[in-house]
């Protein structure tokens, strides 16, 4: 059994951010699901409230042009989103990889990005939609 202290040198090389949040949740007695499902209403609402709170902090930080607070809010959004993933039993590492692969499939047949007039990345001929359903069973 490996016991992790509050900080381990090189920890970021050992665990993904999603796994670090799992460690936090287990340490603090929060439920970490291994199978995808909804939690009880109280937990579902907590997860939604945490994400909403951090999004509001991001809006305020951007309005006041405070990069330190933007960094804090963005990091907290990631943290509470990963926590929600664990609360719902959804492996966000695997989901992220699937979405990343899908996003990279948007390249044109020449291997270059395709943009619309506003600068939005468009879907290329080899685009495939991410299949997140395989991570929900």
Model-derived features with residue positions:
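Flexible "arm" and connector segments at domain edges
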Residues: 2-137
